[in-house]
Amino acid sequence: MSELVRKLSGTAPNPAFPRGAVDTQMHMYLPGYPALPGGPGLPPGALPGPEDYRRLMQWLGIDRVIITQGNAHQRDNGNTLACVAEMGEAAHAVVIIDATTTEKDMEKLTAAGTVGARIMDLPGGAVNLSELDAVDERAHAADWMVAVQFDGNGLLDHLPRLQKIRSRWVFDHHGKFFKGIRTDGPEMAALLKLIDRGNLWFKFAGVYESSRKSWPYADVAAFSRVIAAHAPERIVWGTNWPHNSVRETAAYPDDARLAELTLGWLPDEAARHRALVENPEALFKLSPVKAT
């Protein structure tokens, strides 16, 4: 099998991204940080690092980025923090914490640019829902957010735990409803009620990981449109770069076309602007973009 080649340039998204656009979901890697036991290996092909991502930012029109701790590094945040330092003021981190994370640890992580913690309740994840209470306690005290990922078809089972989250939090990857979700079903009703509580956002990212169909992912589009129409102030967007589940060059997404598709599920241009700028500023407590 030939080495994976990632597409990093092309025709820009139409309409163009607004000034201050935030990519809220991606991973980045530097040499010297091997994969750890319990998680997947490092991404295929050449290690996707800061220089590659800067090309993607220029192509798409991204100004700010949230670098999310990858599963390959499990509970060692060293790679993610090094990437944030390399990217400078444009970048912040979502990292792994648990019940052993001290207040001093939290202070150091915050000083290094961390704005959130990750829960990944799927195979290969470092910290799952069983540790949510401890993660939420620390995140809330630090004014961080929590990124939560699990099989969305278990939403009703997890509801009592999710209703207790005090931090701002985001339901990752279009909810990952692997068995699908009816727009008039109980899971959708429960999700909209959770959003209405005021501290939950919904992330448009990695649609191909959640869909049971091929492009244009009509199944995910149907319920994503409902959520976006219900609460346009609660939608955030991410590239999910470098698309770690993709193994072949021929299957590698065109990030501009993928962004056009998923952002097109928002009800209007004002909602698109909010999803790219104001909503992530609220979720991650980012400083607002200064007017020119």
Swiss-Prot record:
It catalyses: D-galactaro-1,5-lactone = D-galactaro-1,4-lactone. InterPro entries: Amidohydro-rel, Aro_Compnd_Degr_Hydrolases, GLI/LigI, Metal_Hydrolase. The keyword Ribonucleoprotein does not apply. Does not require a metal cofactor. The keyword Transmembrane does not apply. It comes from the Bacteria. Keywords: Isomerase. GO terms for molecular function: hydrolase activity; isomerase activity. Its EC number is 5.4.1.4. Pathway: Carbohydrate acid metabolism; D-galacturonate degradation via prokaryotic oxidative pathway. Catalyzes the isomerization of D-galactaro-1,5-lactone to D-galactaro-1,4-lactone. This is a step in the oxidative degradation pathway of D-galacturonate, which allows A.tumefaciens to utilize D-galacturonate as a sole carbon source. Belongs to the metallo-dependent hydrolases superfamily. This is D-galactarolactone isomerase. It comes from Agrobacterium fabrum (strain C58 / ATCC 33970).
